[in-house]
Amino acid sequence: MARIEGIDLPRDKRIVIGLTYIYGIGNTSAQKILAEAGVSEDVRVRDLTPDQEDKIRAVVDGYKTEGDLRREVSLNIKLLQEIGSYRGMRHRRGLPVRGQHTKNNARTRKGKKVSIAGRKK
């Protein structure tokens, strides 16, 4: 099982799909990484040679992935909250950030409805 950036890639999948298991690498990034490393997209993870694994690791090291990327995203959100921007306020209140309406929907972001006990008409 190939291990890249601390993630065990699934053995039975093609390498282009296996790379997407790493946080911060999607389909397009995976294709670019493999092209730069000179590895075919159709190779299964179990069929990679150690040399190919090393080439892929070297290319992936140039990308911001996993812990570094998660840390950067959380710091960006924290900065928005500290400077008091509208987006920061929406993050702090747990509401949608990108201008969506919240009168009817936004349940995913707002969480489960909270009933008000003892309230009758």
From Swiss-Prot:
GO terms for biological process: translation. PROSITE patterns: RIBOSOMAL_S13_1, RIBOSOMAL_S13_2. GO terms for cellular component: cytosol; small ribosomal subunit. Residues 90-121 are annotated as: Disordered. GO terms for molecular function: rRNA binding; structural constituent of ribosome; tRNA binding. SUPFAM superfamilies: S13-like H2TH domain. Keywords: Ribonucleoprotein, Ribosomal protein, RNA-binding, rRNA-binding, tRNA-binding. The keyword Nucleotide-binding does not apply. Located at the top of the head of the 30S subunit, it contacts several helices of the 16S rRNA. In the 70S ribosome it contacts the 23S rRNA (bridge B1a) and protein L5 of the 50S subunit (bridge B1b), connecting the 2 subunits; these bridges are implicated in subunit movement. Contacts the tRNAs in the A and P-sites. Part of the 30S ribosomal subunit. Forms a loose heterodimer with protein S19. Forms two bridges to the 50S subunit in the 70S ribosome. Belongs to the universal ribosomal protein uS13 family. NCBIfam families: uS13_bact (TIGR03631). This is Small ribosomal subunit protein uS13. It comes from Lactiplantibacillus plantarum (strain ATCC BAA-793 / NCIMB 8826 / WCFS1) (Lactobacillus plantarum).
